[in-house]
UniProtKB/Swiss-Prot annotation:
Residues 12-25 have a biased composition (Basic and acidic residues). This is Small ribosomal subunit protein eS25. InterPro entries: Ribosomal_eS25. It comes from the Archaea. Coiled coil: none annotated. NCBIfam families: PRK09334.1-2 (NF006812), PRK09334.1-4 (NF006814). It comes from Sulfurisphaera tokodaii (strain DSM 16993 / JCM 10545 / NBRC 100140 / 7). Residues 1-36 are annotated as: Disordered. The keyword Ribosomal protein applies. Belongs to the eukaryotic ribosomal protein eS25 family. Keywords: Ribonucleoprotein, Ribosomal protein. One of its GO terms (cellular component) is ribosome.
Length: 109
């Protein structure tokens, strides 16, 4: 009837080590993003190299959606949407149809 026995010190130390390692792993996961290149900031800077790749893809296809662009450039869909919006402002592409979810862009030629 004496009650539960205390756990040995080695068991407590092992548990503390495990918890510390798990916290380190969680912090490392938070530091990296899905692509590994982009930071977690909301501002997306589109470099000239990416724009050249997009323009080459536009020459191959007549219709482009954010999904098709994101799969070919290996970027997220939100980044692809921003790229297409920027190209529309520049006059490189035109919006064919726009839905509440997707937009279909046509190469302006």
């Amino acid at each position: 009837m004496g009650g539960a026995s205390k756990k040995p010190i080695s068991t407590v130390e092992k548990r503390m080590k495990k918890m510390a390692e798990e916290q380190q792993k969680k912090q490392q996961k938070r530091a990296t993003t899905k692509t590994g290149k982009e930071l977690t900031s909301k501002n997306v800077v589109i470099d000239n190299e990416t724009l050249k790749k997009v323009q080459e893809e536009l020459k191959k296809e007549t219709i482009v959606t954010p999904y098709t662009l994101s799969t070919k450039l290996n970027v997220t869909i939100s980044v692809a949407k921003k790229i297409l919006e920027e190209l529309e402002r520049q006059g490189v592409v035109k919006i064919g149809t726009k839905d509440r979810r997707t937009a279909v862009y046509i190469a302006a030629s």
